[in-house]
């Protein structure tokens, strides 16, 4: 037995937030600490085993130990990306260990040469792949008895299985991973009936538990005790009698409490006889029992043939395998009518080893490992069987001859798809947009599949970003030495090492995909592509790529993740709708008046603090620099700015009245800001609306969501107060290029004896109470004489030649720049003003930075599903039901698959037209010829024609203008109207057209594509 490195090392006390930040927002600190104390054993280092190990290492367990003494074979390279042809004959675990160890410096990886059941006691979780059922039973008998989590997984061609046994008394602390529900309450009766504020839905279910904070009239209810919920309606629920706490409560906040749940698992031996299934596809509800028998039969077949599985497409082996299945079904006394065709397909594919299946199953299994080690999220209970038979090609001959081994690295894939289909995969020309988490996984999968390795194949990948430390947790092609380098270049290099046949076959770009890069990703570029794959993190770019794919009639593979959730979509020309056909609802935003004057949630104060950061350290600096560098800046601002007064005052303050000459002056400036925002403005608000104010209807003004604030008096010994001064002074110094200090003694010395001027409330100050009122700034901007007076007081730019300020460009992941420090301090001070529970730096960073929670497990699952759809596109499948859009939530073991939505059709003069994919293809004719074509050939009268924002033709235009335009070619007309020459790379023009039919009725028609 080789050295088991650091299995018993001391627990990690601290978590590297810089590395794990995106994952921490999914799991939380407590779960991460538990994980970092858990040793994991992984048996089997083929494609599925290494995928599980890779994800578990990235996630950050205490240690990973590998067991696989089997020698590397050429066919292993179909899915095992850490093996090379030079490793053939060397034990798989021995080759893999050093590659896995590179993934995460905090996770030692070691190899064990021999396994004994007693040795298993070292581990919190044991994962078994590529292992006979007899051996699995031996291991599980021991793990079940000794409270060690056990997971078994197998990938056989387009079929896969997962089995979980976490013991009879597994405690799950959070069953769904959702943020606890929270809401504002209006009232609580002594019977415990809680009514929500302003008829907002509480979202709770019977049996949920909640706790209360900030409840008035019943202070005893704020003790943090979880209380069981009985739902009365969408806006009311009961917590049982609270008579002993008072007669009535009002205001306050409820927060859902996650209560631990006990889950009991059966052992493998019991589960073989009495299985419990998770159903991933409701269209295949009858298949899990078939697969339950078949996967046992595969092990029995291998036992009878010295470990060999049925040969690809071999009918003799398939017939024998079917007999094994019948025998097992009879022994277990299962009332299942075996589907002979389906069962034999499993035999045909048993030696298949597909990286797409390994990625999908490996991501799902790794998440189960994390559940076992953290007790967070609901486990798969207990059998999960999956197939993607729709991916089996029909465009090529699949036979024993075409699927037999070739002695090449793709033999595991050829065993399923055949050698002819392998050539199709090698000939692909693909475009990957994004080389982040999903992009890395996609490139790895393509390298194993042999995508674009043929003579005519090519991969283009673009990503404008550089690698950051936080990327390393899930973008597994990158290493710490790559931080600062370009993602597209590093990813391309990494996969070319995995599969040397890709050397020279990948072109990496650093351009953002958008209108500005159409000179690079133009007509010629898109016309050569077989398909496009999105690996993007924003909707705008996705929509743009989608439009380009529709225009060039290219298939698009779309996917995304959010924490443990993920989705995939396949877009097929002339068959499915496009990505842009349906859109997510817009992101919720907070009313301005709520943020400015009436916050009631910590999210409100964080958003306010984020705006304050921009308003103090970014926007005014930009205005100053524009004033100093642009001669017409003032004139333009007075005409176009929504708040010209603020722009002018910013320039005056930052150049004259508040310009610091030393860091000490920056400290004093920060102190003034404290009084302004957390004392004076609050006093002014209370002057306008005293705490006993009533509305026009006689109701208390400060009630419901409006909380009466309390001014803060500065105390240098209060940590939040001091943190604000340090962050604000440091950022202000950064703007002016002054050296900042962190020594508290300096701040105490500067601020000693400072007495702020007493606050004097101002009359006539208007405060916006609701969204319907005019913002007070609007009125202030109407005094043109005062605006001119401020403008005249500014120093001329000529007196400050060469002087510039440095704006603070918000960067959430640099802990040394004071950005999150400032926002956290400002948000929490405002929370103190309004009696809102403050948030720590971690939560503040999440909200202010709009961080998208991410897990390497979800990314792996998504990439696997996308590649299963890619195979269908290569095959050219024509039936919409053969494609699948997928959605999953690994936290609750939910997988759903649906047929894509068909592209909508319409009829124009009796002719059926596809609303998305059809277009009128015309040469660069004259405007008159175009109008005549539609009149004669389509029976339509053109009423309007445009290109982008340029109106080319309208039937109501003056006759003189029409006479000038009708003889011009479309390209000439566009150039004349836009006053710009068409770019040389452009081969097409897109025109939007409005038409009437013979009855004068407006008709919806597709766009026109003019070929130049």
From Swiss-Prot:
GO BP terms: DNA damage response; protein ubiquitination; ubiquitin-dependent protein catabolic process
Single Gene Ontology MF annotation: ATP hydrolysis activity
Effect recorded for residue 598 to A: Nearly abolishes enzyme activity
Crosslink site: Glycyl lysine isopeptide (Lys-Gly) (interchain with G-Cter in ubiquitin): 588
Any one cellular-component term (Gene Ontology): nucleus
The keyword Acyltransferase belongs to this UniProt entry's keyword annotation: no
Major localisation: cytoplasm
Lineage top rank: taxon: Eukaryota
Pfam families assigned: E1_4HB (PF16191), E1_FCCH (PF16190), E1_UFD (PF09358), ThiF (PF00899), UBA_E1_SCCH (PF10585)
Statement: the UniProt record of this protein carries the keyword Ubl conjugation: yes
Residues engaged in binding Mg(2+) 1: 465, 468
Gene3D superfamilies: NAD(P)-binding Rossmann-like Domain (3.40.50.720), Ubiquitin-activating enzyme E1, FCCH domain (2.40.30.180), Ubiquitin-activating enzyme E1, inactive adenylation domain, subdomain 1 (3.50.50.80), Ubiquitin-activating enzyme E1, inactive adenylation domain, subdomain 2 (3.40.50.12550), Ubiquitin-activating enzyme E1, SCCH domain (1.10.10.2660), Ubiquitin-activating enzyme E1, UFD domain (3.10.290.60)
Residues annotated with Phosphoserine modification: 264, 903
Pathway the protein contributes to: Protein modification; protein ubiquitination
Annotated active site: 593
Effect of residue 701 to A: Nearly abolishes enzyme activity. Abolishes enzyme activity
Reported function: E1 ubiquitin-activating enzyme that catalyzes the first step in ubiquitin conjugation to mark cellular proteins for degradation through the ubiquitin-proteasome system. Activates ubiquitin by first adenylating its C-terminal glycine residue with ATP, and thereafter linking this residue to the side chain of a cysteine residue in E1, yielding a ubiquitin-E1 thioester and free AMP.
Family: Belongs to the ubiquitin-activating E1 family.
Note in the entry: There are two active sites within the E1 molecule, allowing it to accommodate two ubiquitin moieties at a time, with a new ubiquitin forming an adenylate intermediate as the previous one is transferred to the thiol site.
Name of the protein in question: Ubiquitin-activating enzyme E1 1
Organism: Schizosaccharomyces pombe (strain 972 / ATCC 24843) (Fission yeast)
């Amino acid at each position: 037995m080789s050295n088991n490195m650091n299995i018993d090392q001391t627990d990690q006390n601290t978590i590297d937030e810089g590395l794990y930040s995106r994952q921490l927002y999914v799991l939380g600190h407590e779960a991460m600490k538990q994980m970092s104390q858990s040793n994991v054993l992984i048996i089997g280092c083929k494609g599925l085993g290494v995928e599980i190990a890779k994800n578990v290492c990235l996630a950050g367990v205490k240690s990973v130990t590998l067991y696989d003494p089997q020698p590397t074979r050429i066919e292993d390279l179909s899915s095992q990306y850490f093996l090379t042809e030079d490793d053939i004959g060397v034990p798989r675990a021995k080759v893999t260990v050093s590659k896995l160890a590179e993934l995460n410096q905090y996770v030692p990886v070691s190899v064990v040469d021999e396994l004994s059941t007693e040795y298993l006691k070292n581990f919190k979780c044991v994962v078994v792949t590529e292992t006979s059922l007899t051996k699995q039973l031996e291991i599980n008998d021991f793990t079940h008895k000794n409270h060690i989590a056990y997971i078994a997984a197998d990938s056989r061609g387009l079929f896969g299985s997962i089995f979980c046994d976490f013991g009879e008394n597994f405690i799950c602390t959070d069953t769904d991973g959702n943020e606890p529900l929270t809401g504002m309450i209006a009232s609580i009766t002594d019977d415990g009936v809680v009514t929500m504020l302003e008829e907002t839905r509480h979202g709770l279910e019977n049996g949920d538990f909640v706790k209360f904070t900030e409840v008035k009239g019943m202070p005893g209810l704020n003790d943090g005790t979880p209380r069981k919920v009985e739902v009365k309606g969408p806006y009311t629920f009961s917590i049982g009698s609270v008579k002993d706490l008072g007669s009535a409560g009002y205001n306050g906040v409820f927060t859902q409490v996650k209560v631990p749940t006990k889950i009991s698992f059966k052992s493998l031996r019991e589960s073989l006889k009495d299985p419990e299934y998770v159903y991933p596809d409701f269209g295949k509800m009858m298949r899990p029992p078939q697969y339950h028998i078949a996967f046992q039969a595969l092990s029995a077949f291998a036992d009878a043939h010295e470990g060999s599985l049925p040969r690809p497409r071999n009918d003799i082996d398939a017939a024998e395998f079917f007999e094994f299945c019948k025998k097992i079904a009879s022994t277990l006394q299962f009332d299942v009518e075996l589907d002979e065709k389906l069962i034999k397909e499993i035999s045909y594919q048993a030696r298949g080893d597909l990286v797409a299946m390994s990625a999908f199953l490996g991501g799902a299994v790794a998440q189960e490992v994390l559940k076992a080690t953290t007790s967070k999220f609901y486990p798969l209970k207990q059998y999960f069987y999956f197939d993607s038979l729709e991916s089996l090609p029909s465009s090529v001959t699949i036979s024993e001859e075409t699927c037999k081994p070739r002695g090449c690295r793709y033999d595991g894939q050829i065993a399923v798809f055949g050698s002819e289909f392998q050539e199709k995969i090698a000939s692909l020309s693909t475009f990957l947009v994004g080389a982040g988490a999903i992009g890395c996984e996609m490139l790895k999968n393509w390298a194993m599949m042999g995508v674009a390795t043929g003579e005519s194949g090519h991969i283009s990948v673009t990503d404008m970003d550089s690698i950051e430390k936080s990327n390393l947790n899930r973008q597994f092609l990158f290493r710490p030495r790559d931080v600062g380098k370009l993602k597209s270049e590093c990813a391309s290099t990494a996969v070319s090492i995995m599969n040397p046949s890709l050397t020279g076959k990948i072109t990496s770009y650093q351009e953002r995909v958008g209108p500005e890069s159409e000179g690079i990703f133009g007509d010629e570029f898109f016309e050569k592509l077989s398909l496009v794959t999105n690996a993007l993190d924003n909707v705008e770019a996705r929509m743009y790529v989608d439009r380009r794919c529709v225009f060039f009639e290219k298939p698009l593979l779309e996917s995304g993740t959010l924490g443990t959730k993920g989705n995939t979509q396949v877009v097929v020309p002339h068959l499915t709708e496009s990505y842009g056909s349906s859109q997510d609802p817009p992101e919720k935003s907070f009313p301005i008046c709520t943020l400015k004057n009436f916050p009631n949630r910590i999210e409100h104060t964080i958003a306010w603090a984020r705006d304050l950061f921009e308003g103090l350290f970014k926007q005014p600096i930009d205005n100053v620099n524009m004033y100093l560098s642009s001669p017409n800046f003032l004139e333009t601002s007075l005409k176009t700015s929504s708040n010209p007064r603020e722009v002018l005052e910013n320039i005056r303050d930052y150049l004259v009245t508040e310009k610091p000459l030393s860091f000490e002056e920056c400290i004093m400036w920060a102190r003034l800001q404290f009084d302004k925002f957390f004392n004076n403005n609050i006093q002014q608000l209370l002057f306008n609306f005293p705490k006993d104010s009533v509305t026009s209807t006689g109701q208390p003004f400060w009630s419901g969501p409006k909380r009466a604030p309390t001014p803060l008096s500065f105390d240098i010994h209060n940590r939040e107060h001091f943190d604000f001064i340090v962050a604000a002074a440091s950022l202000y110094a950064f703007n002016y290029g002054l050296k900042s200090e962190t020594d508290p003694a300096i701040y105490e010395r500067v601020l000693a004896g400072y007495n702020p001027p007493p606050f004097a409330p101002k009359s006539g100050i208007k405060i916006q109470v609701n969204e319907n009122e005019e913002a007070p700034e609007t009125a202030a901007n109407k005094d043109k004489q005062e605006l001119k007076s401020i403008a005249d007081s500014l120093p001329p730019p000529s007196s400050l030649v060469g002087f510039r300020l440095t704006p603070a460009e918000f960067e959430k992941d640099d802990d040394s720049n004071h950005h999150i420090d400032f926002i956290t301090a400002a948000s929490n001070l405002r929370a103190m003003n309004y009696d809102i529970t403050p948030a720590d730096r971690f939560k503040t960073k999440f909200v202010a930075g709009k961080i998208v929670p991410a897990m390497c497990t979800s990314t792996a699952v998504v990439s696997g599903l996308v590649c299963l759809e890619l195979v269908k596109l290569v095959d050219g499948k024509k039936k919409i039901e053969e494609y699948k859009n997928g959605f999953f939530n690994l936290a609750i073991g939910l997988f759903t698959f649906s047929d894509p939505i068909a592209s909508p059709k319409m009829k124009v003069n009796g002719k059926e037209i596809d609303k998305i994919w059809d277009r009128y293809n015309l040469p660069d004719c004259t405007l008159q010829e175009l109008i005549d074509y539609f009149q004669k050939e389509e029976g339509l009268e053109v009423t309007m024609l445009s290109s982008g924002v340029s109106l080319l033709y309208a039937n109501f235009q003056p006759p003189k203008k029409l006479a000038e335009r009708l003889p011009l070619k479309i390209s000439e007309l566009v150039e004349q109207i836009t006053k710009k020459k068409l770019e040389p790379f452009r081969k097409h023009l897109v025109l939007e057209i409005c038409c009437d039919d013979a009855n004068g009725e407006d008709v919806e028609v597709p766009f026109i594509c003019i070929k130049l």
